[in-house]
């Protein structure tokens, strides 16, 4: 699979008393990682970072996604975005293009109480893995604490 067959974007955020607070990252086909973290808490400023990652990182990302089997899931029964917030995950991998939208998930309790706990659990753990990878890449590359 060539890198031109791959794209990933994740967003989680809400609009509250501190304005629009969100975390967003994307991996583009050319290996560019774009990261944005906006928190207005105590007048924090938005953190925006961009870096190129090696082909091996992109291959590992694809492996994580393939292993998760997220492409077999459907968000039809997942909780819709609400005042607490929203999450979006978009993936292009090979000839598949999938997009998921759901509310923010606080914990596995929220997952287990949903109408599709098995599918939402796949999403929940994949997002945890992706965030961990991105925070590590950003932290190592820029020597900052992403959150």
Curated annotation (Swiss-Prot):
One Pfam family this sequence matches:
Mago_nashi
Task: Indicate yes or no for the key word Cytoplasm.
Answer: yes
The answer to keyword Nucleus applying to this record is yes
Q: What is its main location?
A: nucleus
* Biological process annotations from GO: mRNA processing; mRNA transport; nuclear-transcribed mRNA catabolic process, nonsense-mediated decay; regulation of alternative mRNA splicing, via spliceosome; regulation of gene expression; regulation of translation; RNA splicing
Question: Which positions, given as ranges, span the membrane?
Answer: none
The places in or outside the cell where this protein is found are: Nucleus; Nucleus speckle; Cytoplasm
Q: What SUPFAM superfamilies does this protein map onto? A: Mago nashi protein
One annotated Gene Ontology cellular component of this protein: catalytic step 2 spliceosome
Q: Name one GO molecular function term.
A: RNA binding
Q: Which InterPro entries match?
A: Mago_nashi, Mago_nashi_sf
What are the UniProt keywords, alphabetically? Cytoplasm, mRNA processing, mRNA splicing, mRNA transport, Nonsense-mediated mRNA decay, Nucleus, RNA-binding, Translation regulation, Transport
Q: Could you describe the subunit structure of this protein?
A: Part of the EJC core complex that contains casc3, eif4a3, magoh and rbm8a.
Q: What does the record give as the function of this protein?
A: Core component of the splicing-dependent multiprotein exon junction complex (EJC) deposited at splice junctions on mRNAs. The EJC is a dynamic structure consisting of core proteins and several peripheral nuclear and cytoplasmic associated factors that join the complex only transiently either during EJC assembly or during subsequent mRNA metabolism.
What the record says about family reads: Belongs to the mago nashi family.
Provide the protein name: Protein mago nashi homolog
Taxonomic lineage from the root: Eukaryota, Metazoa, Chordata, Craniata, Vertebrata
Name the gene. Answer: magoh
């Amino acid at each position: 699979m060539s890198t031109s067959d791959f794209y990933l974007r994740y967003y989680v955020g809400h609009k509250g008393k501190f304005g629009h607070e969100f975390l967003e990252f994307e991996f583009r086909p050319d290996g560019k990682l774009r990261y944005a973290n906006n928190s207005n808490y105590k007048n924090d400023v938005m953190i925006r970072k961009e870096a190129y990652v090696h082909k091996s990182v992109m291959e590992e990302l694809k492996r994580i996604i393939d292993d998760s089997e997220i492409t077999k899931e459907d968000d039809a029964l997942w909780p819709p975005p609400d005042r607490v917030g929203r999450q979006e995950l978009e993936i292009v991998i090979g000839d598949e293009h999938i997009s998921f939208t759901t509310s923010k998930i606080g914990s596995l309790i929220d997952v287990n109480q949903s109408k599709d706990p098995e599918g939402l659990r796949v999403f929940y753990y994949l997002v945890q893995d992706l965030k961990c990878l991105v925070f590590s890449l950003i932290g190592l590359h820029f020597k900052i604490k992403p959150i």
